Each structure stands twice: as structure tokens, then as C-alpha cells.
């Protein structure tokens, strides 16, 4: 029995320790297992001009993307800015490069009840989208540093807000068209290129997302430990290689291995992700494209994609369409945008379990309309699924409790004779048909489910700002009054009392104080996760009490 209890608490302790370690890392603190979080490079207060070419040619016969100035002597700050808005998104587009330098998400609010500002261009934080042209013949073409003019704006025939910006250099005119769809975080972006010179130009369109490596602002509605991100940085998706996370630290060390060449017709996109939110370019897939990433001066990082436009002859016009996503990682929405786009939502290493758990939780919420009650119903369903295993476990524990006096007597009888004691215990287990390890299997099986649910609640923007009842106004952050952790501590204490008392005094004390230790740790977990654990404990107590009553009437032989 001692061995069984040791395995039980070792498994439970390890799962709790892993979750606490995740919280430490998320908060930017050193991991319990060594290794401090990488510090973010400082972002210069004032950007400088850099004309260095730092992205090599990767598409055969295509020009490289020049790392033209990230800004042009403060041009973005001083340039005229234009606003484009629908019912969920407000974009700010700078005349310098026609870059999208600000994006406010009207349906996602901060602690100050203001819209989350995902894209920003400030002295302390830079995160924006840009695009432009390069050519083998002439790099001085309309790019992300050129001055663009607003040539048309308003609403199209479908009532969609739009704006058209244009710039011309060396006989090449680039028009960028931005169209917002109602209720959508996806921006339709068109690049129309017209060649007026007598010499044909092999042109390449590049689309990039640029940001610094600083952690995103604490944008949970009520702050808290779990406002921190799961992963912040560039990601790339191709149909062949699937989803690739690119750490800022790996980019610094040139240790990035991503599929650079994307075949024609193969779905691919590039993005920047952070906790709850993401931005992405989804170019067309008619031709082969090239993915690249790197660090730019001033502590800025970029990920981009080159799309060859071919040889553009005199008087010719080429139009290349793309989509720019700027918004929350709502799984139902992400699935409709592009192949593999739902992978932007990070479930960690247990995605295979977390995705169906979220699917079930989301469908329950569809009918219930409250995420707190949805978590409770999900807990009941999970408990029903594991009921046969749990019943077997509790029966085994109840039988162990029955023979507890006999085990104590055996320890006295065979004191100093461990071999005879083990033989006597095994013989008793055989006669009573007791498996001393029978209570461990359900615990071991449920640990991955518990960790998967942890990632579901941590990663799901759907629960961000979602209330339950009374004092719980946001299930994604810790309980502000610690009521749920206290209830959980009491429930764990009751559970230990329903279990057989370990004969070892030290082990008995460990089991007595374990609920307190874990409850303190759960003070920092999202209220939704603690709610799941509380309900699970209460159901377990009811089930175990019933089984104890059933077997308590049967005396041990």
C-alpha cells in the first residue's frame, strides 16, 4: 500500500510541479529546471537609418529583399496617417510605406476597458505589417519606406470600407488597396503594379510582419499571472512542413531551419503570435514563394514572404492579392481563414488531446452560453468517461482500508523481517483479491487530460474576460478573492480523510499537508482551471464516499 500511495502522490505532485513551472516561465521567471528566460533586446527610442541588404536571394532568379530602412529618419512618426474601420477592427495606415502601424481590436478590451492595440508604433514598442517591391534591375522601387498618397477611399459596392494608396519610382507604380469586411479581422490587400518604362522588370513583392522581442503588454481584462504569453514570436506554415515556431533567440543565433521555398499551389502563410492574439500574411499560392526571417537593427525581428511577379513589361499591369489577419485566436474563426490557420492557437505538446477537449467545451458553450457552467458540464462528462476506472480505483482503495488493521498487525509480527512481511502481504492481497496498485491507473490516465485542459483554458481567448457567477468576472485569470482555491483545499483534505491512513507517520503527514501546498499553488492558476478541479474533487468525494459505504459493510476476512 505504501508503494501505491507513493506512486499516487508522486504522479499528482509531478503534474502540479509541471504546471507551476509553466507558470514560472510564462511570468518571465527562471524555469525550476534551469535556464533563465531570454531577455528581450532593447528597442531604441529613436530608430536609425539602415540601408544594409541582409536577406539573401532564395528563389531562383529572384532578387533579394533589401533591408531598406525600418523607418526613414523618423518618417513613419511624422508621416500622415489614415484610419480604416469596421465593426471589430480599426487600422491606422501610414503614408510612409502605406504600412499598417496600428490595429485596435474593438471586441477585445484591456483592464482599462480600452480596445486591445495589437499593432503599435511607439518609442517603446513596435509591431506592424509592411510590404513593397524589389527588382534585379533596380532596388529603388516603391517599398515600405516610400511616400504613398491616398488616391481613393470610401465604401465599395458591398458597403465595405476601403482605401487605395499609390507610390511611383523609376517608372514602376505600386497601388496598395486595403478592404475591410464586416465583422472580420481579415483585411483584403491588393498590390497592383504597373510598369511604364521601356525596359521589362523582374519584380518581386514582399510582405512582412515586424515586431520587437518584448513581451506583449498585460492585456488581460483584470491582469493576473496568466496574462503572460504562451509563445511570442514568428511562425511559418507550409502544407508540407506544417507549423514552425521560430524563437527570437534562435534567430539571433542563426539557428532557424524553416522551409524557405514554397511550391506553386502549396498553401503557406507567415505570422507573429502572442498570447491570445496573432497577425499574419496569407499571400496567394499561384507561384512559388519564399519564406525568410531575420533580425533587423534596433532590436526588431521580421518574418516575410517573397512572391515573384514575373517579368513585367512596358505598359503591363500585374495584380497580386493577399490577406492580412490581425485579431484574436478564436478557433472557430481561424479554421475558416486558411489551411492550418487554427494552429496559431497554441495548445502545447498535448494538442492531440486539447483540441477535442476544446471542441467539446465549445459545443457545450454553444448551448449553455456561459463558459463557467460549460466547464462544470465538461468536468461531469469527463468524470462519466472515467467512471469505470475511477470506480475500480476507489474500490481498490476501499478494500485497502478494510485490511488496514491486518497490515498494521503484520508489520508488528514481522518487524525486522522484510522478506516475510512482503510474502505475508502478497498472500493476503491474493486471498482478498486486492490489487495494491489498482488506485494508480486512473490517476496516471487523468494527468494528461488535466494538463490538456490546463492548456485549453490558458490558450483560449474565448474564455478571456468571460464571467461565471458573482465574484468570478474572468475565468482566464486567478480568483480575485481566492474562494475557489480555498474550496479546493477543503475538498482535497476531505479526500485524504476518505483514503486509508498510511501506516508510515511521515507519509501520513505528507498527505495531510499536501492539500495545503497544492492549494497555495492553485491560487495563481486561472479561475476556470480551479473551477474544473473543484468540481472534479467534489464528484470524486461523492463517488468515493458511496463506494466506502458499500464496502464498509463488508468486514475483512
From Swiss-Prot:
Its main location: membrane. GO terms for molecular function: membrane insertase activity. The chain crosses the membrane at residues 371-391, 437-457, 515-535. InterPro entries: Membr_insert_YidC, Membr_insert_YidC_N, YidC/ALB3/OXA1/COX18, YidC/Oxa/ALB_C, YidC_ALB_C, YidC_periplasmic_sf. It is a multi-pass membrane protein. It is found in: Cell inner membrane. One of its GO terms (biological process) is protein insertion into membrane. Keywords: Cell inner membrane, Cell membrane, Chaperone, Membrane, Protein transport, Transmembrane, Transmembrane helix, Transport. GO terms for cellular component: plasma membrane. It comes from the Bacteria. Required for the insertion and/or proper folding and/or complex formation of integral membrane proteins into the membrane. Involved in integration of membrane proteins that insert both dependently and independently of the Sec translocase complex, as well as at least some lipoproteins. Aids folding of multispanning membrane proteins. Belongs to the OXA1/ALB3/YidC family. Type 1 subfamily. Interacts with the Sec translocase complex via SecD. Specifically interacts with transmembrane segments of nascent integral membrane proteins during membrane integration. This is Membrane protein insertase YidC. The gene is yidC.
